[in-house]
Curated annotation (Swiss-Prot):
Cu(+) 1 binds at T18, C19, C22. This is Copper-transporting ATPase 1. It comes from Homo sapiens (Human). Widely expressed including in heart, brain, lung, muscle, kidney, pancreas, and to a lesser extent placenta. Expressed in fibroblasts, aortic smooth muscle cells, aortic endothelial cells and umbilical vein endothelial cells (at protein level). The lineage of its organism: Eukaryota, Metazoa, Chordata, Craniata, Vertebrata. ATP-driven copper (Cu(+)) ion pump that plays an important role in intracellular copper ion homeostasis. Within a catalytic cycle, acquires Cu(+) ion from donor protein on the cytoplasmic side of the membrane and delivers it to acceptor protein on the lumenal side. The transfer of Cu(+) ion across the membrane is coupled to ATP hydrolysis and is associated with a transient phosphorylation that shifts the pump conformation from inward-facing to outward-facing state. ATP binds at E1081.
Length: 1500
């Protein structure tokens, strides 16, 4: 570098910029100024950074140049900063034909070249450049005859290596970034930081949680980059001080992808040796890319390893090493020693190769003509709207020509495209935008994982490695991410669960099994979600583990299976040769990835590429071989939800038990009557004990068949045995399996109660027979039959009720069609053939016919026909929806009239209905926080009840022997014919058994899940999708509801509110103004221009307007043009003759003090229409005040007052001038949704605080808030600050619900306690939101909170039922309330236990009576209370307010928003107004670029 050259940099603040057009204008104009080398203008920072020659320009002259363009420029720091330069020495080749002065003039015209010196004798050119603007490669491209003089560079580098290289080079920085969870985070950071001025390259590693940045320190500082990363929500700190690069391009790329080592600071490259060899190793035990990175980073640290490339797919590693220093066997052991030390390595080959000698002292210079292979990354872009292979070819053809694109593969079946690209030349966002520009909907996949490919350098390009020595025993273990990287998920249907103890039993035991990471069991849904390691365990084994616990288990879904996997039943196979024939034939077909045929089961499992081949093609191939093939039928029914099998089981069990119980009950009643009769005789006649015994024995049932065995006890025993052992067999099996795994549940309590009663009775009976007792013992043989009757009745009723709780989900599942009619069309859309196929065989792009009354089998787009479609069960929309060509249809909706042909766009699990079903199922599987308490309580319930039962037995035995009168007083049916001891024991056992019978953990376990299941189902039926029990429970705790503005409170689309006709000396008609303005704005791409054109076409009832020429846009001001050919349009509709009925318009006499209406026709143009007049031109100006003033027009105070009034209401006022006459004013605004004011009022009446949060300016925000009745507003809040604002509200102790569009507001939705995504239609898989409202209706926000409150109230009622039965019933059963006459028999306790579970489920079913309130039901009582707020009642907080601000710099999202924010006034901005601009409503995938809208308004 030559410091004397003196190139400076200055930063100038620029006010008045409103959009990117302003930026472009300043850069173009100032960039042409003599002496200006480079200029970069930032809209969000409102400044311009200029690199200039101080000999030709000064900061003051540059400031004045910007001022002259109509902007306000201010220099805050008058001291310019020096800019680093460098000198290149270029040698002229012998083939040079150009004159020296031509070379000099050519190079001096190049931006970034400050000086040139020519040495003809030495055939050398010394070029002084600014490295941040131009480089040697660009100089060579300008003059190909020049080549870099490496010798001169060596001398210069050796002379002042530290100084010059540090100044002229770039700096590499390693920064630790925390909080990243997925590759979307890395892409966001790379996209935003990579676009900052001075940042050359950036690579963010998710595994290492760090960012490697190559930047120019004179343009950006470390602190600025750190603040930018933290502004995105990721904590960042510098891991290592930045170092100036002294490396070539290859080394930089390698450095960016090499983890930081903790040893010496200076980086050196591993040398290449003359006897380098290459060895290939097979490595088993790698599971993920983290393993690959671990092996590569560890081996590359070895001193004698030149390079290593590890392939996860091929399980191999190719290592280049110095054969004289290390052997392949040593390398093999080194790989096996890499943490965690589980790799198995074998050597396959060794190839000898030679390379250049190393340079031990300094880095070898890389010749300039050696071009390194750049980084290659891979991104997946989801593409909607493709209908055929022509679309695929079109996208591939256009995108493949884009700069930086290496390859592209578009899949019609998967609706996505995989692009390999150079991240230094393009980005995923750019590619996505390019696809959208072609007319398709494109979004970046959440699963994008950058694939970094670095070319293996030749001997001329050695790799950079660390100087660290390799070590093994002291190595820091690498975090094992096997669970996250190598896990699969399956769903298992579980039957036989009765309470929360069963859930806890399954979860606890399965977590102990090797290979199972987590398990979540849903009692009500009867489903278990299991995450497991497929290398260790498979779903059938998991199901078997559950069956061993005593429950039924069936694998119902494998979450890893999806498109590309086919399971078929193949009939006609006789031997192994048939199997071989099918497998070999299929694997020869292109697109078949894997095929396995099992002769024993007659099943074929096939993996295929859906881009190349489809399931119908595979079936046809098998059938062509002479076999029959059909799809394995999947159970699409909701049989596991309606509990039909369980209902049948318990109904049968109840009837069997009842058959034996009725005689037992008859005997018991008979004995009770007789005991009462004898007690009366004893009381009246004062009979002795002997007389009582004789009287009892005279009864038929008390007669002894054998000594000690009465007829009564024999009959009771015979009736009890079948019930005890056959009716109770199910309970014995379940109790045994539970106890085997050291757990206890309701079945254990039942078995204990019945077994103790039966065993006690049998033992006492055998003892009496052995002793030949004359008095018959009192037994409990009547207890087991009566217990089992009430238990079976309770379970029967409980499962009936459970089936009712799942009706909503069952209805959704029943909507799924089973078959589809696929048709074949010719080129003229004439039907050629029809074919009925299973819905699983439908592929994307198929043409499907749907007849009247039929269900749509898949999501699709109508290509032919008109009809009305019933979507009520999916969206909650009661009225049928009209469908025409181009309309989208939803799977499961019903076609009412008219046949339709649709093109399938989403099939299988990707359909809207499948997504809704999946979401509701997962919601009903999840557990609410309050349920976790119940589950924990149930785990201790059974042991506690057993303890209470034993304690009751012992206490009553002790009380009986100490004070027999108590037992005698409260023992029902006591007679003096039995001994005291027997009476005490029987009474104690009766109380103990009753305690076991009445206790019911089931009611506690059912209280929450039944209510959650019914609540989520009712919500789904009403178009409110609640993602689980937690948001359902949390919503009732919400105290603050925060609304986004654009698209939530408002429609999000600008519309014309009012057109005023202004007259001075001449007048012009309303329709003529519309024709002129509509024609003029038809060339505008701005949302406001589009809104004006749309309005004009609607008012004029035409699709074609006049002709617009000489169209010009002046950013920040307005447009000018000339309009012709409108007279024919006006004459056609007879509007040019008379214009008496002017809609939404008035005429204003601007030279008078008052408005006055006019019905006169235009006087500017004569009413006679002729061919000559058709060619008449109108000079049109449309814009703001400043634009009119610039063009010499005077704005009267009355007109200015009109504009101010509109601006106060948050509208944009645009002036129209025709032929230099001010003749019209158009007011445009984003309109408030009709139900918004009512919804806000209802929320306030529910005791909730309502807040409006918007990025729009304060005046517009205040206007919208006043219209809907919101008194607290946060305006000008950037997207990155919305999260901070929500967090601030939460720190005040408030539970916050955030209502937004679910896309741009996703960070705030995730931060809020309850995120509500509104108006997303069929996009029901928004991860950030907790509640998804299918319909774009704000009253559904009210309904979701109301439903939550009703559900939580029902849960509390359920707990009251459960606790009453247990907390009150158990003490009664134990005899605590005997002094007041409350005594329970065991059968009574059993009936109470059964009633508790049934009552809880029936209580939850009351939620099915919930009806979402309608607009009319809300509107009538609120009519008198609703009123707009005055501006003085509204509190507006601007910006981030008092929350801490991480960075003054804006992120990419904020910059895009700012680019598109300028309000209607600022589009055409004059600095006096602060009105807002509204956006057009683009599709949801285009919100990130182009016509982006956050909740702000875009610039014209």
């Amino acid at each position: 570098m030559d410091p004397s050259m003196g190139v400076n940099s200055v930063t100038i603040s620029v006010e008045g910029m409103t959009c990117n057009s302003c930026v472009w204008t300043i850069e173009q104009q100032i960039g042409k100024v003599n002496g200006v080398h480079h200029i970069k203008v930032s809209l969000e920072e409102k400044n311009a950074t200029i690199i200039y020659d101080p000999k030709l320009q000064t900061p003051k002259t540059l400031q004045e140049a910007i001022d002259d363009m109509g902007f306000d420029a201010v220099i805050h720091n008058p001291d310019p900063l020096p800019v680093l330069t460098d000198t290149l020495f270029l040698t002229v080749t012998a083939s040079l034909t150009l004159p020296w002065d031509h070379i000099q003039s050519t190079l001096l015209k190049t931006k970034g070249v400050t000086d040139i010196k020519i040495y003809p004798q030495k055939r050398t050119v010394a070029v002084t450049i600014i490295p941040s603007i131009v480089n040697a490669n660009q100089i060579k491209e300008l003059v190909p005859e020049l080549s870099l003089d490496t010798g001169t560079l060596e001398k210069k580098s050796g002379a002042c290596e530290d100084h010059s290289m540090a100044q002229a080079g770039e700096v590499v920085l390693k920064m630790k970034v925390e909080g990243m969870t997925c590759h979307s985070c890395t892409s966001t950071i790379e996209g935003k930081i990579g676009k900052l001025q001075g940042v050359q390259r950036i690579k963010v590693s998710l595994d290492n949680q760090e960012a490697t940045i190559v930047y120019q320190p004179h343009l950006i500082s470390v602190e600025e980059m750190k603040k930018q990363i933290e502004a995105m929500g990721f904590p960042a700190f510098v891991k290592k001080q930045p170092k100036y690069l002294k490396l070539g391009a290859i080394d930089v790329e390698r450095l960016k992808n090499t983890p930081v080592k903790s040893s010496e600071g200076s980086q050196q490259r591993s040398p290449s040796y003359t006897n380098d060899s290459t060895a290939t190793f097979i490595i088993d035990g790698m599971h993920c890319k983290s393993c690959v990175s671990n092996i590569e980073s560890t081996l590359s640290a070895l001193q004698y390893v030149s390079s290593i490339v590890v392939s996860l797919e091929n399980r191999s590693a190719i290592v280049k090493y110095n054969a004289s220093s290390v052997t392949p066997e040593s390398l093999r052991k080194a790989i096996e020693a890499v943490s965690p030390g589980l790799y198995r390595v074998s050597i396959t080959s060794e190839v000898e190769s030679t390379s250049n000698s190393p340079s031990s002292s300094s880095l070898q210079k890389i010749p300039l003509n050696v071009v390194s292979q750049p980084l290659t990354q891979e991104t997946v872009i989801n593409i909607d709207g493709m209908t055929c292979n022509s679309c695929v070819q079109s996208i591939e053809g256009v995108i493949s020509k884009k700069p930086g694109v290496k390859s592209i593969r578009v899949s019609l079946a998967n609706s996505n495209g995989t692009v390999e690209y150079d991240p230094l030349l393009t980005s995923p966002e750019t590619l996505r935008g390019a696809i959208e520009d072609m007319g398709f909907d494109a979004t970046l996949s959440d699963t994008n994982e950058p694939l970094v490919v670095i070319a293996q350098p030749s001997s001329e390009m050695p790799l950079l490695t660390s100087t660290n020595e390799f070590y093994t025993k002291g190595m820091t273990p690498v975090q094992d991410k096997e669970e996250g990287k190598n896990s699969s998920k399956c769903y298992i249907q579980v039957t036989g669960m009765t309470c929360a103890s069963c859930v806890a039993n399954i979860e606890r035991n399965l977590r102990r099994e090797e290979g199972i990471y987590s398990i979540l069991v849903a009692l009500m849904a009867g489903k278990a979600e299991v995450r497991y390691n497929p290398a260790v365990i498979q779903p059938p084994m998991i199901a078997e583990f559950i069956r061993e616990l005593g429950f039924g288990a069936t694998v119902i879904e494998n979450a890893d299976e999806g498109d590309g996997v086919l399971e078929l039943v193949v009939r006609g196979m006789t031997c192994a040769s048939c199997v071989h024939k099918i497998e070999s034939s299929l694997t020869k077909h292109r697109g078949i990835l894997y095929c396995s045929v099992a002769l024993a089961t007659n099943k074929a499992h096939i993996k295929y590429d859906p881009e190349i081949i489809g399931p119908r093609d595979i079936i046809h191939t098998i059938e062509s071989l002479g076999f029959e093939a059909s799809l394995v039928k999947k159970d699409r029914s909701a049989s596991h939800l309606d509990h039909k099998r369980e209902i049948r089981q318990w109904r049968r069990s109840f009837l069997v038990s009842l058959f034996f119980c009725i005689p037992v009950m008859g005997l018991m009643i008979y004995m009770m009557v007789m005991d009462h009769h004898f007690a009366t005789l004893h009381h009246n006649q004062n009979m002795s004990k002997e007389e009582m015994i004789n009287l009892h024995s005279s009864m038929f049932l008390e007669r002894q068949i054998l000594p000690g065995l009465s007829v009564m006890n024999l009959l009771s025993f015979l009736l009890c045995v079948p019930v005890q052992f056959f009716g109770g067999w199910y309970f014995y099996i379940q109790a045994y399996k539970a106890l085997k795994h050291k757990t206890a549940n309701m079945d254990v309590l039942i078995v204990l109660a019945t077994t103790i009663a039966f065993a006690y009775s049998l033992i006492i009976l055998l003892v009496a027979m052995y002793e030949r007792a004359k008095v018959n013992p009192i037994t409990f043989f009547d207890t087991p039959p009566m217990l089992f009757v009430f238990i079976a009745l309770g379970r029967w009723l409980e499962h009936i009720a459970k089936g009712k709780t799942s009706e909503a989900l069952a209805k959704l599942i029943s909507l799924q069609a089973t078959e589809a009619t696929i048709v074949t069309l010719d080129s003229d859309n004439i039907l050629l053939s029809e074919e009925q196929v299973d819905v699983e065989l439908v592929q994307r792009g198929d043409i499907i016919k749907v007849v009247p009354g039929g269900k749509f089998p898949v999501d699709g787009r109508v290509i032919e026909g008109h009809s009305m479609v019933d979507e009520s069960l999916i969206t909650g929309e009661a009225m049928p929806v009209a469908k025409k060509p181009g309309s989208t249809v939803i799977a499961g909706s019903i076609n009412q009239n008219g046949s339709l042909l649709i093109c399938a766009t989403h099939v299988g699990a990707d359909t809207t209905l499948s997504q809704i079903v999946k979401l509701v199922e997962e919601a009903q599987t999840s557990k609410a926080p309050i349920q976790q308490f119940a589950d924990k309580l149930s785990g201790y319930f059974v042991p506690f009840i057993v303890f209470v039962s034993i304690a009751t037995l012992l206490v009553w035995i002790v009380i009986g022997f100490l004070n027999f009168e108590i037992v005698e007083t409260y023992f029902p049916g006591y007679n003096r014919s039995i001994s005291r001891t027997e009476t005490i024991i029987r009474f104690a056992f009766q109380a103990s058994i009753t305690v076991l019978c009445i206790a019911c953990p089931c009611s506690l376990g059912l209280a929450t899940p039944t209510a959650v299941m019914v609540g989520t189902g009712v919500g789904a039926q009403n178009g409110i999708l609640i993602k689980g029990g937690e948001p359902l429970e949390m919503a009732h705790k919400v105290k603050v509801v925060v609304f986004d503005k654009t698209g939530t409170i408002t429609h999000g689309t600008p519309v014309v509110n009012q057109v005023k006709v202004l007259t001075e000396s001449n007048r012009i008609s309303h329709h003529k103004i519309l024709a002129i303005v509509g024609t003029a704005e038809s060339n505008s791409e701005h949302p406001l221009g589009t809104a004006i054109t749309k309005y004009c076409k609607q008012e004029l009832d035409t699709e074609t307007l006049g002709t617009c020429i000489d169209f010009q846009v002046v950013p920040g001001c307005g447009i000018s043009c000339k309009v012709t050919n409108i007279e024919g349009l006006l004459h056609k509709n007879n509007w040019n003759i008379e214009d008496n009925n002017i809609k939404n318009a008035s005429l204003v006499q601007i030279d008078a003090s008052n408005e006055q209406s006019s019905t006169s026709s235009s006087m500017i143009i004569d009413a006679q229409i002729s061919n000559a007049l058709n060619a008449q031109q109108y000079k049109v100006l449309i814009g703001n005040r400043e634009w009119m003033i610039r063009n010499g027009l005077v704005i009267n105070n009355d007109v200015n007052d009109f504009m101010t009034e509109h601006e106060r209401k948050g509208r944009t006022a645009v002036l129209v001038a025709v032929d230099d006459e001010l003749c019209g004013l158009i007011a445009i605004a984003d309109t408030v949704k009709p139900e918004a004011e009512l919804a806000i009022h209802i929320l306030k009446s529910m005791g909730l605080e309502v807040v409006l949060m918007t990025g729009d300016n304060s005046k517009t925000a205040r206007s919208i808030a006043s219209q809907v009745g919101i008194t607290k507003v946060f305006a000008e809040v950037l997207p990155s600050h919305k999260v901070a604002k929500v967090k601030q509200l939460q720190e005040e102790g408030k539970r916050v619900a955030m209502v937004g569009d679910g896309i741009n507001d996703s960070p705030a939705l995730a931060m809020a306690n309850v995120g509500i995504a509104i108006g997303t239609g069929t996009d029901v898989a928004i991860e950030a939101a907790d509640v998804v409202l299918i319909r774009n209706d704000l009253l559904d926000v009210v309904a979701s909170i109301d439903l939550s409150r009703k559900t939580v109230k029902r849960i509390r009622i359920n707990f009251v039922f459960a606790l009453i039965y247990n907390l009150v019933g158990i003490p009664i059963a134990a005899g605590v309330f005997m002094p007041i006459g409350l005594v329970l028999q065991p059968w009574m306790g059993s009936a109470a236990m059964a009633a508790s579970s049934v009552s809880v489920v029936l209580s939850s079913l009351f939620l099915k009576l919930y009806r979402k309130p309608t607009y009319e039901s809300y509107e009538l009582p609120a009519r008198s209370q609703i009123g707009q707020k005055s501006p003085s009642e509204i509190s507006v907080h601007v910006g981030i307010d008092d929350t801490s601000r991480n960075s003054p710099k804006l992120g990419l999202l904020d910059r895009i928003v700012n680019y598109s924010r300028a309000s209607i006034n600022s589009l055409l901005s004059d600095k006096r107004s602060l009105n807002s601009v509204v956006t057009s409503e683009p599709d949801k995938h285009s919100l990130l670029v182009g016509d982006f809208r956050e909740d702000d308004d875009t610039a014209l």
